[in-house]
């Protein structure tokens, strides 16, 4: 079983037990986070595609780590002028472990009168 979730402006294909680095989340280490924006769920032969998201589907994960990526160095220069500008950037991330992919019942029983 796998799902495609959307968080931080990006889409991720996740399975249960998978470790994943996503854009920074506000939760602390050890807390649980629930991703409700599930775009697709595949369970065996069944395939549920959302328009734009699957109803009653959720992916639960546990926050494992908060950190920063490796530094990316940016160098801008103008040729023949000995003009250079150096800059670095480190993106914040949250490492999560996917604990559960839940696909709720979208169909609800409707009670009708026997009249």
Swiss-Prot record:
One of its GO terms (molecular function) is rRNA binding. InterPro entries: bL21-like, bL21-like_sf, Ribosomal_bL21, Ribosomal_bL21_CS. GO terms for cellular component: cytoplasm; ribonucleoprotein complex; ribosome. One of its GO terms (biological process) is translation. Keywords: Ribonucleoprotein, Ribosomal protein, RNA-binding, rRNA-binding. Part of the 50S ribosomal subunit. Contacts protein L20. Belongs to the bacterial ribosomal protein bL21 family. This protein binds to 23S rRNA in the presence of protein L20. This is Large ribosomal subunit protein bL21. It comes from Coxiella burnetii (strain RSA 493 / Nine Mile phase I). The gene is rplU.
């Amino acid at each position: 079983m796998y799902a495609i979730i959307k968080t931080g402006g990006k889409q991720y294909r996740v399975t249960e037990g998978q470790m994943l680095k996503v854009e920074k989340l506000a939760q602390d280490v050890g807390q649980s986070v629930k991703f409700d924006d599930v775009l697709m769920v595949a369970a065996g032969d069944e395939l549920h595609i959302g328009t734009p998201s699957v109803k009653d589907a959720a992916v639960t994960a546990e926050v494992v780590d908060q950190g920063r990526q490796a530094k990316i160095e940016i160098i801008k220069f103008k040729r023949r002028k000995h003009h250079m500008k150096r800059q670095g950037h480190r993106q914040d991330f949250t490492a999560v472990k996917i604990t559960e992919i839940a696909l709720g019942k979208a169909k609800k029983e409707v009670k009708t009168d026997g009249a």
